């Protein structure tokens, strides 16, 4: 194999990358099965309390007041305008809304909280959301498998799916290890990671397919190195700009966007890695050749009639 000038030998360390991938995947799965996922109220059920303040509310201050009143599990979010606050708590107490409003009124008499509504989300609804979220993920992966298989070839499809599964496992493993609350926003982030990673993978796959036509004497490993190097600047620019935007959400978005930002941040890094060292390596394992990309020709029928 001849490495051209300007081409990085990405596949030269594929065995080391595979070992790293295996270790990280085992750690992620181990955390997943031992610590479990810290599901939020969207999936476990609980009480939703909407409060209205006379003046704009400081969410950090409200959260501190609730902790001081003994409600450590309360999740505080802005809702509507700056005076509306939504409090989520894992409790079935029908009097909880009044108790929370009273505690906040006593903590800050200058800007009292008025109870607007109280709703209880049962665990059955949460389980239904959880099942639908898992089903949505499976349907997304199935659709991707069909699309890539139709658009490219089944070997590409398998490489793409394995890389996406890896990304989802790594993200869920990190969320499990640090016990980040998994709610609907985090689920949306995981699905967004799947789409982002697939986009990276498709860009490289498209260049690999094109280079099979252009670089007829190059073997598969050389083709993968050249194709990845040719798309490297695009990959770096996209990943860095995306990570900078996510970092802004992570540091300035507050607690409400923390899980969402963490899932996206980890997912983008994992997706960039997997598009090179999982999706491409699968093509090597499956021994992709240029003949795999040539559509079968219809056999010519021979007229035996005299």
Swiss-Prot record:
Protein's name in the database: Protein translocase subunit SecF
Biological process terms in GO annotation: intracellular protein transmembrane transport; protein targeting; protein transport; protein transport by the Sec complex
Source domain of life: Bacteria
Keywords on record: Cell inner membrane, Cell membrane, Membrane, Protein transport, Translocation, Transmembrane, Transmembrane helix, Transport
A single GO molecular function term of this UniProt record: protein-transporting ATPase activity
Summary of subunit composition and partner proteins: Forms a complex with SecD. Part of the essential Sec protein translocation apparatus which comprises SecA, SecYEG and auxiliary proteins SecDF-YajC and YidC.
Localization annotation: Cell inner membrane
Family to which the UniProt record says this protein belongs: Belongs to the SecD/SecF family. SecF subfamily.
Bilayer topology annotation: Multi-pass membrane protein
Function recorded in the entry: Part of the Sec protein translocase complex. Interacts with the SecYEG preprotein conducting channel. SecDF uses the proton motive force (PMF) to complete protein translocation after the ATP-dependent function of SecA.
Residue intervals passing through the bilayer: 17-37, 134-154, 158-178, 185-205, 232-254, 268-288
Matches recorded under SUPFAM superfamilies: Multidrug efflux transporter AcrB transmembrane domain
Any one GO cellular component localisation term in the record: plasma membrane
Gene that this sequence comes from: secF
